[in-house]
Swiss-Prot record:
Alphabetical UniProt keywords: ATP-binding, Cytoplasm, Endoplasmic reticulum, Hydrolase, Metal-binding, Nucleotide-binding, Transport, Zinc
Residues that, per the record, bind ATP: 27-34, 227, 254
Keyword Transferase among UniProt keywords: no
Name of the protein described by the UniProt record: ATPase ASNA1 homolog
Enzyme nomenclature, EC number: 3.6.-.-
PANTHER family reported for this sequence: ARSENICAL PUMP-DRIVING ATPASE ARSENITE-TRANSLOCATING ATPASE, ATPASE GET3
Catalytic center residues: 56
Length: 329
């Protein structure tokens, strides 16, 4: 095995000609948004068009770039091919046309309430319909904390179960609905209409599911910090991703403290972190592990993000500390 086969950068992702979907995720507070912004910035250098999507209800993209984003792709200031959007994968935000079925006499909201999670599945399908129609070269997802992300990635199987339950309901109650429809002059609930909408949603999800499980098209980048809970959750996340057949070959370790003269607290924390860095090295010896430093200022604004993003492709050298434009001496 060559020494540089698992180089400590994300060059393998940046240089991939086929990757379409890139997920960035991990425990809350580890720097997922900063990392996803940095990944998108590096991709914008080599791709025709890049879309960065936040599925985290906290929506930190606007804060990171210092620019307001909405649920429609917006060009990031300072770029010509990088777009960003912030979405909430909930039925209230993403699937109004599904809820309009109520005007035909069918209250879909009540129906989806009977099948836990299917409303989220339909909403996610609507997001993917939109994203696919826009035809960006690559899409980067800034995801919510681990549990929420795994739910989204598990949606295809959830939707299959929901549709099977719906079809069973249709078979069992079609006679009742038809009778009600006759009494109301044909304005009662249309199960056929409902089935068409769900089947359309299922088709999109199935197509996306195939792509998500294709390592040439999709990869996941876990972000962690060298502390017990973060390392533990990262390992659990990677195990779950493996069960879902989703590729993961990169790990980003953020907020690393390096030794400093006359800083006993820094040195004590660095010593504590070393134990977990050693664990990460043992666990992910066959991964691209990128190490990022804890900085003295927040990484906010395009100039700082551009500078920080370089650390994803050029390993950090603590002998030449990174100084951000907004950093005070």
């Amino acid at each position: 095995m060559a020494d540089d086969e698992f180089e400590p950068t994300i060059e393998n992702i940046i240089n991939s000609e086929k990757l379409k979907w890139i997920f960035v995720g991990g425990k809350g507070g580890v720097g997922k948004t900063t990392t996803s912004c940095s990944v998108a910035i590096q991709l914008s250098k080599v791709k025709e068009s890049v879309l960065l999507i936040s599925t985290d209800p906290a929506h930190n993209l606007s804060d990171a770039f210092g620019q307001k984003f909405t649920k429609s792709p917006t060009l990031v200031e300072g770029f010509t091919n990088l777009f960003a959007m912030e979405i909430d994968p909930t039925p209230d935000q993403l699937a109004p046309e599904f809820m309009e079925t109520q005007s035909d006499g069918f209250n879909l909201q009540e129906f989806t309430a009977a099948i836990p999670g299917i409303d989220e599945a339909m909403s996610f399908a609507e997001v993917m319909k939109l994203v696919k129609s826009l035809e960006f070269s690559v899409v980067v997802f800034d995801t919510a904390p681990t549990g929420h992300t795994l739910r989204l990635l598990s949606i295809p199987s959830l939707l299959d179960k929901g549709i099977n339950k719906f079809l069973s309901m249709q078979q069992n109650f079609s006679g009742i609905f038809n009778a009600v429809s006759g009494m109301m002059g044909g304005n009662a609930p249309s199960l056929e209409n409902m089935e068409g909408k769900i089947q359309s949603t299922k088709k999109v999800i199935e197509e996306i599911n195939i792509q998500f499980k294709n390592p040439d098209l999709t990869t996941f980048i876990p972000v962690c910090i060298p502390e017990f809970l973060s390392v533990y959750e990262t390992e659990r996340l990677i195990q779950q991703l493996t069960k879902l057949d989703i590729d993961v070959h990169n790990v980003i370790v953020n907020q690393i403290v390096y030794p400093e003269k006359d800083c006993s607290l820094c040195n004590a924390r660095q010593k504590m972190q070393k134990k977990y860095l050693d664990q990460i090295a043992d666990l992910y010896f066959d991964f691209h592990v990128t190490k990022l430093p804890l900085l003295k200022a927040e990484v906010r604004g395009v100039p700082s993000l551009k500078l920080f993003s370089e650390l994803l492709i050029k390993p950090y050298d603590p002998s030449t500390p990174l100084v951000l434009p907004n950093q005070e001496n």
